[in-house]
Amino acid sequence: SDLNPIMDLITFVDVGIPIEAVMVVLSQVPPGFSRRLNLRDGRAYYYQVETLIFGRAIERALYPERYIIGCDDPSQPLAAPYETFLKAHECPLLPMRYESAELAKISINCCLVASISVANTLAELCENIGADWAEIVPALKLDRRIGQYSYLSPGLGIAGGNLERDLTTVCEFSDRLGTDAGVVKAWISNSKYRKDWV
């Protein structure tokens, strides 16, 4: 992705707001982005992970599950006005270094994609052997290793640009760093297979 528009906007805001103002960025960015920013000395800057669910944006803003907060040094207290805002929602606060927060967003989406891929693959198998995926799902949700909130609804592959972008980011980092992203490439392949089925 071209990150220049986000960089330009952050620079514009950094110069335009008072130095004591806290800057919080929610845009999806790759690991290492926040650490590379060249902000004015003394600027309090945080990267906050946002996990949007289509059709439930307001609900998730009002009742967040948790806040994942990327910061320069997670052992230091958050800026007071920002911490006051976050604590008003009475949910867990997870401060971590910038890179961890940036990768946490991608990790969440990868786990979601894994669930979607499992559901799609096994639901199709059900159709071919006379099983009913809807009967199997409750058994999975009662298994504590999987859980009641698991996303186990089959569909037509991975939908939404954020998921696909995160998979691409993982593959690019993996290729550059020499790590194995075979399972991620398999998820992409499975999604394409499901979409081509239509």
Language model segments and positions:
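Rossmann-like NAD(P)-binding element
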Residues: S1-V22, G32
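A general structural signal for well-ordered alpha-helical segments in protein cores
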Residues: I6, I10, A79, A104, ...
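Short strand-turn motif at the edge of the Rossmann-like AdoMet-binding core
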Residues: L26-V29
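Short secondary-structure boundary/capping elements
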Residues: N4-L9, I53, P95, N162
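NAD(P)-dependent Rossmann-like dehydrogenase/reductase catalytic/cofactor-binding core
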Residues: E127-V198
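Internal alpha-helical scaffold of NAD(P)-dependent oxidoreductase catalytic cores
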Residues: G16, R36-Q48, I53-Q148, F173-L177
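Gly-rich Lys/Arg/Thr-decorated short loops/hinges at beta-loop-alpha junctions or inter-strand turns
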Residues: S1, Y63, A181-G182
